[in-house]
Curated annotation (Swiss-Prot):
The gene is dapL. It comes from the Bacteria. It holds the Pfam family Aminotran_1_2. The keyword Transferase applies. InterPro entries: Aminotransferase_I/II_large, DAP-NH2Trfase_DapL_Desulfo, DapL/ALD1, LL-DAP_aminotransferase, NHTrfase_class1_PyrdxlP-BS, PyrdxlP-dep_Trfase, PyrdxlP-dep_Trfase_major, PyrdxlP-dep_Trfase_small. It catalyses: (2S,6S)-2,6-diaminopimelate + 2-oxoglutarate = (S)-2,3,4,5-tetrahydrodipicolinate + L-glutamate + H2O + H(+). Keywords: Aminotransferase, Pyridoxal phosphate, Transferase. Involved in the synthesis of meso-diaminopimelate (m-DAP or DL-DAP), required for both lysine and peptidoglycan biosynthesis. Catalyzes the direct conversion of tetrahydrodipicolinate to LL-diaminopimelate. Is also able to catalyze the reverse reaction in vitro, i.e. the transamination of LL-diaminopimelate with 2-oxoglutarate to produce tetrahydrodipicolinate and glutamate. Can also use m-DAP instead of LL-DAP as the amino-group donor, and oxaloacetate instead of 2-oxoglutarate as the amino-group acceptor. Its cofactor is pyridoxal 5'-phosphate. The modification N6-(pyridoxal phosphate)lysine is found at residue 238. Its EC number is 2.6.1.83. The keyword Amino-acid biosynthesis does not apply. This is LL-diaminopimelate aminotransferase. The lineage of its organism: Bacteria, Bacillati, Bacillota, Clostridia, Moorellales.
Length: 390
């Protein structure tokens, strides 16, 4: 039987392709160093694991959870926002628990997008913004993120007829894949734009806590009026090394949160309650581990930037995320450069065109392996590339 058109038209998921390349190379006996997928390699804090173990022994947690999540977890999220950002959230109406923020990002279009509707999607950007749009029958209008504009979308360049048809605008800062950051002035411009065109802003803040050199990323919800026009997604995945635990949230505008909770109640049965209790421990417990996470990633960032600059690049150190976004050398496309370094150096990088057309000419490096393996990757590239030109 033929698959549905929505499946046939989906692009292959970027990271599934990368994982396949890694597996194939390792089957050939190649010692692969992966700078590709951004999956934290440090352990989850021990007090979080201990909480999971304790709650897993409670039979009450073996039953169906509520789709909107434990009130205690949503309260912990609200307290976290008040402590970090001074943002007030009603945990009952303005927070919903997610099975990882990716799940909510994929589902939010089902709440508002009908066939023929438009979502505003960053390019380059996390592929799920576009995929969720397509699954809902919508169309993506891609907002170019260019180095000349600090990898921020130029809101004034979006045609008014497109903006009037748009239902959702996805933004993501600190940004994957570019590592760019946004300030409250930009967020305020987004709020005014959303008001002008009656659209909903969906801010993906997954990397909000992965920051360096004393920089602290603002929340979109800190911008005056932001809670009237949008929501913010976040999770415990990156700051607490819990990507495999699948626990996140959306928070902000109450009617949007209610709509997302309604979709979830008809699609999934919520996150395992023991994991939610562990999430509470992560958000409310000791935070010294987060300081160490930042220190380790900052050290790795410096190794990558300084190492690639010694090969001829001119990279600046990103203020946030655990990615470095770099141009490909002269004579290569994103894909051809990634293929070459895999074949000749046994190093995986992520081609920028996997994040959209405006990612062409770039590649992404993830800082989620040990510094020793990073240094080895740089030396392998030195042997293969020599000194590069742009």
């Amino acid at each position: 039987m033929q698959e549905a058109r929505r499946i046939r038209e989906l692009p292959p998921y970027l990271f599934a392709r990368i994982e396949k390349k890694i597996a194939e190379a390792r089957e050939r006996g190649v010692d692969i160093i992966s700078l590709g997928i951004g999956d934290p390699d440090m352990p989850t804090p021990s007090h979080v694991i201990d909480k999971l173990v304790a709650e897993a022994h409670n039979p009450e947690n073996h039953r169906y959870p509520t789709s909107e999540g434990l009130l205690a977890f949503r309260q912990a999220v609200a307290d976290w926002y008040q402590r970090l950002y001074g943002v007030d959230l009603d945990p009952r109406r303005e927070v919903v628990t997610l099975i990882g923020s990716k799940e909510g990002i994929a589902h939010i279009s089902l709440c508002y997008v009908d066939p023929g509707d438009i979502n505003l999607v960053p390019d380059p950007g996390y592929p799920v913004y576009n995929i969720g749009t397509l699954l809902a029958g919508g169309e993506s209008y891609f907002m170019p993120l260019t180095a000349a504009n600090g990898f921020l979308p130029d809101l004034g360049a979006i045609p008014s007829d497109v903006a009037r048809r748009a239902k959702l605008m996805f933004i993501n800062y600190p940004n994957n894949p570019t590592g760019a950051v946004a300030d409250l002035k930009f967020f305020q411009e987004v709020v005014e734009f959303a008001r002008s065109y009656d659209l909903i802003v969906c801010h993906d803040a997954a990397y909000s806590e992965i920051t360096y050199d004393g920089y602290r990323a603002p929340s979109f919800l800190q911008a005056p009026g932001a809670k009237e026009v949008g929501i913010e997604f976040n999770s415990v995945s990156k700051p607490y090394n819990m990507t495999g635990w699948r626990l996140g949230w959306a928070c902000g505008r109450a009617d949007v949160i209610e709509a997302l909770a309604r979709i979830k109640s008809n699609i999934d049965s919520g996150a395992f309650q023991a994991v939610q209790y562990a999430g509470i421990a992560a958000l409310t417990g000791p935070q010294e581990g987060l300081a160490e996470v930042r220190r380790v990633y900052q050290e790795r960032r410096d190794i990558i930037v300084e190492g690639f600059n010694s090969l001829g690049w001119h990279l600046e150190k990103p203020k946030a995320t655990f990615y470095v976004w770099a141009p490909v050398p002269r004579g290569y496309t994103s894909a051809s450069f990634a293929e070459m370094v895999l074949e000749k150096a046994g190093v995986i990088i992520t081609p920028g065109n996997g994040y959209g057309n405006y990612g062409e000419g770039y590649f992404r490096i993830a800082l989620t392996i040990s510094k020793e393996r990073m240094q080895e990757a740089i030396e392998r590239l030195r042997r293969v590339l020599g000194k590069v030109e742009f």
